[in-house]
Amino acid sequence: IIVDETDRLSALVNSVMELSKVSSGAEKLNPVDFDMSQLCFEVAGRYDAVCEQNGWTLQLEANKECMVRADPAMMERVLHNLLGNATHHMGADGVFVLRAIPMPNGGCRVEVEDHGPGIPPEELPHLFDRYYRARQDAGKTGTGLGLSITKAILQQHDFPFGVNSTVGKGSTFWFEMKAPQ
């Protein structure tokens, strides 16, 4: 129990420090041009073992080049936060989806979809708030900071983001990235 609680407290402290650095601007952006589809492919590959262990399926829909300008390390953190969130809200089918969709005017729309319980409309405005936990999250592990960190990173990049959700069907978290200049 002591080891578990120490790990939990350590994760919380690390999340608070990460959020503080990103929110304050202490962690500076290092934007470069890169293919977001390729980053999605690399990040999805890191979920192979956990998916196999749990009988889950991560569907990757990132078949077309999706050139963007952003900080790839920060975008990787966003992907891990959203995919981790999806694994906590996995539906009975065990499927979650990562999409990188080229936008007509350039750039890329990224979506992470789960087939879980969905989020009631009255909770949607609070999802990205610090420490906010949706009612169905009561008793689940986590710091309640992952979506706040995601929000801070996306705001620092000036990327629009949001969530679409239907109770009983699941949720899709999305953000839109700018094309290289």
Q: What do these predicted regions represent?
A:
Residues 30-45:
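A conserved beta-strand-to-alpha-helix junction within the catalytic ATP-binding
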Residues 119-131:
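Short conserved segment of the HATPase_c
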Residues 4-9:
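Short alpha-helical segment of the dimerization/phosphotransfer core of two-component systems
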Residues 50-59:
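Short conserved segments within the C-terminal catalytic ATPase subdomain
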Residues 24-29, 67-70:
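Conserved micro-motifs of the catalytic ATP-binding
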Residues 86-87:
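Short helix-loop "hinge" at the ATP-lid/N-box region of the Bergerat-fold HATPase_c
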Residues 158-159:
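Conserved glycine-rich
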